[in-house]
């Protein structure tokens, strides 16, 4: 029988033991382990050099970028009812999820103003609860980053404790985890009717943020903006790019606030000559928290932070019919259409928009195309790729 393209058979290499010609062993696992270790070492070296993770995400089926950024769950001190509602939404909605810090409370005695003593749950208890929650929608979590509570020091004991607690959970589900910041590039097809006419990239800077909260909520947004610009400048310098982010998403401050910043961007033709400019929107979003009322000094800084503010983002691009590739332009070739809405309302229930999105973003038209693409694949490959594609 001919071995198919998607065969899961592997080559077994029987290596003869040097000290006993009658003993043989299979060194495949050893070679694979060495390969994995070298790959991880190279990736970690890049992360240490830049402090920034980079994740390209291809929107494979459909033309919408869909994602939910989550931070500051502080799981063991979070409101159980709100946790349950968010789990239900993520489990039943076609969307990507990005975690960016303080998902666990990680009680550490002697740190963070005695906050560690406000819960009777241990770190092991919290890990078990978070693992159970994550297992419901782990296939939708494309990456995770950050998590330093209120300590920005790179080698702080608190950060070390957090990473040690949460990294194994993400690795268990195959979710890439970046200790610091993350730049996500969504590669988006652009459609005109039912025909793909091009592609573009949506850039998101995702991080946890650090430092004390400002006296006003908008001040925390400004800190998020400044820290996000620092990340993208370092990213551009290291990779030789000229990326201007579409989103800067942070947490840490529990600010429940957002602001749009306008920056001027040039438009270039195929020869690299500037043929105009336009005002580009950088959407800066600072998450709230779902901790109970007195579990954080940040909560006392901003009394309304307990209003759930986790949002669903949906972005697609439309073709600019007025764009002239050979002339001057004051708007880009592809224009983003951004939809965002709160997943929960102020009562802690699923919002009407969230219910509608959860129900309607189920495009079954892709099913036949996927079956055609993977007609010779085993079921596991078909299911995994199909789910991953839809989730993007």
Model regions and ranges:
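Active-site neighborhood of phospho(di)ester-bond hydrolases with catalytic His/Asp-centered motifs
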Residues: 68-72, 96-102, 141-148, 177-179, ...
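A short C-terminal boundary segment appended to hydrolase-like catalytic domains
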Residues: 305-392
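Conserved beta-sheet core of the metallophosphoesterase superfamily
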Residues: 201-205, 210-324
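Core catalytic region of metal-dependent phosphoesterases/phosphodiesterases
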Residues: 53-64, 70, 75-178
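An acidic, phosphate/nucleotide-engaging active-site surface
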Residues: 155-207, 211-219
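Beta-strand-turn-beta hairpins that frame and shape the catalytic cleft
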Residues: 56-68, 185-205, 277-282
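Ligand-binding grooves and catalytic loops that recognize ribose/phosphate and carbohydrate rings
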Residues: 7, 11, 112-135, 228, ...
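Acidic, histidine-bearing metal-coordination/catalytic regions of metal-dependent phosphoesterases
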Residues: 1-69, 392
């Amino acid at each position: 029988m001919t071995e198919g393209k998607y065969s899961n058979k592997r080559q077994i290499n029987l290596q003869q033991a040097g000290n006993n010609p009658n003993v043989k062993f299979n060194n495949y696992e050893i070679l694979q382990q060495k390969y994995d270790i070298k790959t991880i070492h190279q990736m970690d070296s890049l992360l240490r050099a830049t402090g920034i993770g980079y994740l390209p995400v291809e929107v494979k089926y459909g033309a919408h970028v869909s994602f939910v950024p989550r931070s500051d769950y502080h799981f063991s001190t979070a409101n159980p009812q709100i946790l349950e509602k968010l789990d239900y939404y993520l489990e039943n909605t076609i969307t990507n999820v990005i975690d960016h810090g303080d998902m666990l409370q990680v009680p550490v005695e002697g740190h963070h103003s005695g906050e560690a003593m406000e819960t009777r749950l241990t770190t092991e208890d919290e890990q078990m609860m978070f693992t159970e929650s994550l297992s419901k929608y782990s296939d939708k979590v494309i990456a995770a980053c950050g998590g330093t509570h209120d300590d920005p020091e790179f080698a702080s004991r608190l950060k070390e404790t957090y990473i040690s607690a949460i990294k194994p959970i993400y690795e268990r589900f195959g979710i890439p985890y970046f200790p610091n910041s993350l730049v996500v590039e969504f590669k988006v097809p652009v459609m005109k009717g039912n025909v793909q006419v091009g592609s573009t990239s949506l850039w998101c800077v995702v991080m946890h943020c650090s430092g004390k909260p400002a006296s006003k909520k908008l001040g925390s947004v400004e800190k998020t903006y400044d820290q996000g610009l620092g990340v993208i400048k370092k990213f551009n310098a290291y990779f030789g790019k000229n990326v201007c982010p579409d989103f800067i998403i942070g947490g840490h401050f529990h600010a429940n606030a957002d602001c749009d910043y306008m920056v001027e961007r040039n438009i270039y033709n195929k020869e690299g000559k500037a043929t105009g400019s336009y005002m580009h929107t950088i959407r800066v979003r600072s998450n709230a928290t779902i901790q109970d009322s007195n579990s954080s000094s940040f909560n006392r800084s901003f009394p309304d932070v307990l209003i759930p503010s986790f949002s669903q983002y949906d972005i697609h691009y439309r073709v600019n019919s007025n764009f002239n590739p050979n002339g001057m332009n004051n708007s880009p070739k592809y224009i983003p259409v951004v939809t965002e809405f709160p997943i929960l309302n102020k009562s802690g229930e699923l919002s009407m928009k969230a219910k509608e999105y959860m129900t309607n973003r189920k495009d079954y038209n892709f099913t036949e195309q996927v079956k055609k693409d993977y007609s010779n694949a085993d079921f596991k490959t078909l299911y995994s790729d199909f789910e991953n594609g839809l989730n993007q």
